[in-house]
Amino acid sequence: SVMDAAFAAKRAALTVDLLVQNLSPHSNRGSEGAVPTKLYTNTEGIRGSERIPCGADGYLKEEAVEEAKRCIQCHCDECMKSCVYLSEYKKYPGLLAREIYNNTQIIMGDHQMNKPMNSCSLCGQCTVTCPNGFDMSQVCKSARENMVSTDKMPLAPHEFALMDMLFSNSDAFLCKPQPGYETCRYVFFPGCQAGAIAPDVVMDAYEDLCARVEGGVGLILGCCGAISEWAGRYEMTEKVNEQLKQELAKLGDPVIIAGCPSCMKQLKENTGAEVRGIWEILKEIGLPGKARGLEMPVAIHDACGARGDTRTQDTIRELLTAMGCTVEDTEYSRDLSPCCGYGGLTAYANKEMAAKMTEKCLERSDAPYITYCMACRDRFAREGRESRHILELLYGDNACNMPDISEKRYNRLVLKEKLLKNIWNEELMMEKKDYTVAYTEDAIRMMDERMILKSDVEHVLADYRESQEAVFDEETK
């Protein structure tokens, strides 16, 4: 064949080169002929073709062109096919990893790879799709930690998310045993996004667990620390871990019932406690009385936090089937499921990239989406797609309109207030204002896009009312 001829010519050329140098023609030849390769090439959908016969004098020009066309240009882009992050930057992981590493070594000057390293959702999909298991998420996560520890990473890309985590673990934080118990066998940890987006679901779920689970079920409202870990802020994560360990000790170190797969993963790795998903508990004790499935086929979006967790993936599908849902698995589901755009704080560091990630998720099916991560449900609903968190189906509640960033904080406080009042007969005195602020729809939309809280605006106005000092903009009067 022509390849054999080309190999023979190269082999002969190497022999001549060695002889000219007065070296043995048998030395320093390296690997010759066919050798194993680590390069993976997906040949699915590629049809074989007949080799063009080669005459004794070689190919004619036209024959050579036709034979060359049979080459499929072997390359591996399995991770780039499904990962928006890699496909948008149009760089293979090896090259991107090198550039990110070089970025961490810059002492003075522009760190131009900060945005790319902060745009990865840290979901781990690339590791599953890569035939060699290359983990781009670990590269980006380690780089963030390195940049933070050496004071090279600006706070700006993740500041709002980190402040929101601190709010969840301070003003909106709550840790209580079930009434009638000093310590509990279990504690429900719904996660900060559930309380912000669907507070009624959290309340109904907790009341149901208290009524049907033996041994007492405590409650912790707060953040698991995934936010600071994604941001590479190791010290903040350690403070969250210590806070949660202390609160769990007060409850008698109970088994944690997590309402979020990311929380479940984070708490398992950092608290030393036994952690189970609420879906596992409900499978054991039976569906709540208000559980209702959708009458139409539904598409499941598997959460990043459940990647590699076959038990959780199966349990979710079993619960949906038990509710009468017709479950549809999409092309990229289970361990291959893409990130919704919230993971890794992509939604804060690179909104355009996050929007494309959400779009990538939604293009897999036209059916309503069922999630078991509240952040996924929030992002899909914001794009106008009908979606439900599985707990909304299980407890007959629907978050309806997706709250903006200010409403999410307010929802957490209201949830805490209602739980204290209805479950523990305690009053929480929320701050009362003697005035109201009217916002136009455009203002609310712009504030949400720019991550400006209503409370920030009200603090500015309160300061003005006290000091009577302000800057007047002639153009917007």
Regions found by a protein language model. Give the residues of each.
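Iron-sulfur-cluster electron-transfer modules
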Residues: 90-259, 264-273, 411-421
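Ribonuclease/tRNase effector modules and their secretory precursors
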Residues: 400, 404-477
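Ferredoxin-type iron-sulfur electron-transfer modules and their immediate structural context
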Residues: 1-119
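Iron-sulfur (Fe-S) cluster-binding segments and ferredoxin-like electron-carrier domains
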Residues: 38-55, 81-100, 128-146, 230-235, ...
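Cofactor-cradling patches in redox/metallo enzymes
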Residues: 193-279, 305-321, 328-418
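Short coil/turn segments at secondary-structure boundaries
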Residues: 78-86, 155-159, 474
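Extended, hydrophobic interaction surfaces within ordered domains
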Residues: 1-34, 63, 112-148, 240, ...
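Conserved beta-strand elements of the Class I
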Residues: 187-188, 299, 370
